From Swiss-Prot:
Family of this protein: Belongs to the DnaA family.
Protein name as it appears in the record: Chromosomal replication initiator protein DnaA
Region named Domain I, interacts with DnaA modulators: 1-90
Gene name, Swiss-Prot/TrEMBL: dnaA
Assembly behavior: Oligomerizes as a right-handed, spiral filament on DNA at oriC.
Protein species of origin: Ruegeria pomeroyi (strain ATCC 700808 / DSM 15171 / DSS-3)
Binding site for ATP: 171, 173-175
Length: 468
């Protein structure tokens, strides 16, 4: 097959796939040879060859065979001078063939030459959320190490650990800390070039650079930053070309002693389909886990949010126990917890009511159902009996000795706090007791927590053991 014949086929492909697809994926193909039923093309990158093979190979094979060429499959090879190959203005053979065939087609223009500053305008950092600062980040035992490491990096001093990798589940504060670092660096070290973006944005911009043949500009941009921050790095798992470019960018920045900060939803070694060399690089710095929030941290987050809402809802009253109730019932996701509080304040302001337990349970019924604890009454009974070194039958049974009655009341209180069971249901699980007995026991423990330090400590120890 001649270059002129391939040029004619290109015009047919242009009409079939459209201008954008043709310019991006078909026009860069260079026909080289037809050998033993295999049509060989050169491409700028492996990524482009793989994409064309997966998405356009059937169409190209059809057009080749329809034109009388016996082609069984396509082969793509990366050009020797790629990726620095200059953009071509137009394919002379294709233009000549089109003219000879008198086929009028839209002009296929080459990507325009741009300077680095123009590309930089198109690769701006992701916007930072003004709410996500260190001042608004509530610190507790589950996140204190991550917070301390983020603080150290945000000082902009000598690079002591590279990269810093923050990982943890959804809604635990990874993105908050990433934004806080960026904000702090902008204030303390405004001369530094800080680039924050998600791994998804990194991939899309990499693909854009491939399409527009600006890989050298792309490499220069990402290698010229002083601090590179990539959120949700697990997104590039399984994307070989993006991982390769990320790996080379990573190495180049580390070699220049530039700071890299990464976040992920799990430890680097546990990210499936992430290349071993990328995992190894991520693990060579400081890897910090943001643990699931405990009760104290959740309560602190709620108290901080309430203070913020006071400016918007100055007249709203929130009853005692509501924040504690929410901190106990919504334990898996801080975003859900904050969203529940936002909904609660908005609803109360619209209906003009105090935020009490009744309104809370009505307004957040769906959230509370979704966050319902898996802790059972039986589990609480066993844990309390073990803690006080008494038999399970003594907690459930009719004995009224103080050594049994107080643990029984503690168990009832924990059942009320940690399960969705009603008072009558709890009473039935405690030897068929009346709901008023349960109510009395719960109230008694609430009173003793304020006056008896040992009871307060017992309840908290048991709560932590049950929530662990």
């Amino acid at each position: 097959m001649t270059q002129e014949k391939w040029g004619l086929l290109c015009q047919k492909l242009l009409k079939t796939v459209g201008q954008n697809n043709f310019t991006t994926w078909i026009e860069p193909l260079e026909f080289q040879a037809l050998e033993n039923g295999v049509a060989v093309f050169t491409v700028p990158t492996n990524f482009m060859g793989n994409y064309v093979s997966q998405n356009f190979s059937d169409l190209i094979l059809y057009e080749l065979n329809n034109a009388g060429e016996a082609v069984q499959r396509l082969a793509f090879r990366v050009a020797a001078n790629s990726p620095m190959r200059p953009a071509r203005a137009a394919r002379p053979a294709a233009a000549a063939a089109a003219a000879a065939a008198a086929v009028e087609a839209p002009q296929v223009s080459a990507p325009r030459a741009t300077d680095t500053s123009d590309v930089l305008d198109g690769l701006q950092a992701a916007p930072l959320d003004p709410r996500f600062t260190f001042d608004s980040f509530v610190v507790g035992k589950p996140n204190e190490l991550a917070h301390a490491a983020a603080r150290r990096v945000s000082e902009g001093g000598p690079v002591t650990f590279n990269p810093l990798v923050l990982y943890g589940g959804v809604g635990l504060g990874k993105t908050h800390l990433m934004h806080a670092i960026a904000w702090e660096l902008k204030v303390k070290r405004p001369e530094l070039n800080v680039l924050y973006l998600s791994a998804e944005q990194f991939m899309y911009r990499f693909v854009q650079a491939l399409r527009e043949r600006r890989m050298m500009d792309f490499k220069h941009l990402f290698r010229s930053v002083d601090v590179l921050m990539v959120d949700d790095v697990q997104f590039i798992a399984g994307k070989d070309s993006t991982q390769e470019e990320f790996f080379h960018t990573f190495n180049a920045l580390v070699d220049q002693n530039k700071q890299i900060i990464i976040s992920a939803d799990r430890a680097p070694g546990e990210i499936k389909d992430l290349e071993d060399r990328v995992k190894s690089r991520l693990q060579c710095g400081l890897v910090v886990d943001l643990h699931p929030t405990d009760y104290e941290l959740r309560l602190g987050i709620l108290q901080t949010k309430v203070q913020m809402y006071r400016t918007t809802y100055p007249d709203l009253v929130i009853a005692d126990g509501v924040l504690e109730f929410l901190a106990h019932r919504i334990s898996t996701n801080v975003r859900v917890l904050e969203g529940a509080l936002t909904r609660l304040f908005a609803f109360a302001s619209l209906v003009g009511r105090e935020i009490d337990m009744e309104l809370t349970q009505d307004c957040l019924a769906d959230v509370l159902r979704a966050s319902e604890r898996k802790i059972t009454v039986e589990e609480i009974q066993r844990k309390v009996s073990d803690y006080y070194n008494i038999r399970l039958s003594d907690i459930i049974g009719p004995k009224r000795l103080r050594s049994y009655a107080r643990p029984r009341q503690v168990a009832m209180y924990l059942c009320k706090q940690l399960t969705s069971r009603s008072l009558p249901e709890i009473g039935r699980r405690f030897g068929g007791r009346d709901h008023t007995t349960v109510m009395h026991g719960v109230k008694r423990i609430e009173e003793l927590k304020l006056t008896d330090g040992q009871i307060a400590e017992d309840v908290e120890m048991l709560r932590r053991a049950l929530e662990a």
